[in-house]
Amino acid sequence: MKKLVLVRHGQSQWNLENLFTGWTDVDLTEQGQKEAATAAQLLQKEGIFFQTAFTSYLKRAIKTLNIILDVMDLDWIDVHKTWRLNEKHYGALQGLNKKETAAQYGQEQVLLWRRSFDTAPAALEYSDARAPHNDRRYQRVARQDLPLTESLKDTIARIMPYWEVVIKPVLIAENTVLIVAHGNSLRAIIKHLKGISETEITDLNLPTGIPYVFEFDDDMNLCADYFLGDTEAIKKLQESVAKQSQ
């Protein structure tokens, strides 16, 4: 049995402030650090350990992974960081309050920007200081590959080649893999793994810091998927994520 574990980063400062974050590099809150430690304890309790982990270029995911590995005494394992696991780029929405944006443009429009399959927010201007090509962490990435906004469809196109060429072969070889990333980058992977439709993906909400386990047979057929933790508590957290723009 092969196990893939997905963890959305712990609560970030902009999660707490209910701001669109995207590729903005914000830190974890104290609560986010606690969520990461709790995720590690849940994995230990289940007896799930790793030799390889993957994360994004953004510190909220990197620090969540570091805490998990430290608590599990797995600081020595191989860690691969890639910009391809970054959050969906929210374009000109980055830094705006979700409720205030909903009040201005309507909840339906904001829901489309947040959760729909192929609707992207307004793009950043190329000259905007927030544009990824102005950030030195992306200096080795071709400029034409760096987004100024993204839909979930765009995010999937960015992530899935890396899944197929890099992550999936490691999972096949090692049987367990950990990915610590972001709500929409993980939704992209989940849509692929579960064959979720473009319409149904709108309703998938991932709470911060909760391990989501996928089990596969030796032929990489999906056998089961489940969250670790209290079912009712996780359901309430998912509902809270869904209501962020209300």
From Swiss-Prot:
This is 2,3-bisphosphoglycerate-dependent phosphoglycerate mutase. The keyword Isomerase applies. Substrate binds at residues 8-15, 21-22, 60, 87-90, 98, 114-115, 183-184. Belongs to the phosphoglycerate mutase family. BPG-dependent PGAM subfamily. InterPro entries: His_Pase_superF_clade-1, His_PPase_superfam, PG/BPGM_mutase_AS, Phosphogly_mut1. The record marks H182 as: Transition state stabilizer. Catalyzes the interconversion of 2-phosphoglycerate and 3-phosphoglycerate. SMART domains: PGAM. GO terms for molecular function: phosphoglycerate mutase activity. It catalyses: (2R)-2-phosphoglycerate = (2R)-3-phosphoglycerate. Pathway: Carbohydrate degradation; glycolysis; pyruvate from D-glyceraldehyde 3-phosphate: step 3/5. GO terms for biological process: gluconeogenesis; glycolytic process. Its EC number is 5.4.2.11. Keywords: Gluconeogenesis, Glycolysis, Isomerase. The active site is at H9, E87. Homodimer. The keyword Cell membrane does not apply. Gene3D superfamilies: Phosphoglycerate mutase-like. SUPFAM superfamilies: Phosphoglycerate mutase-like (SSF53254). The lineage of its organism: Bacteria, Pseudomonadati, Pseudomonadota, Gammaproteobacteria, Cardiobacteriales.
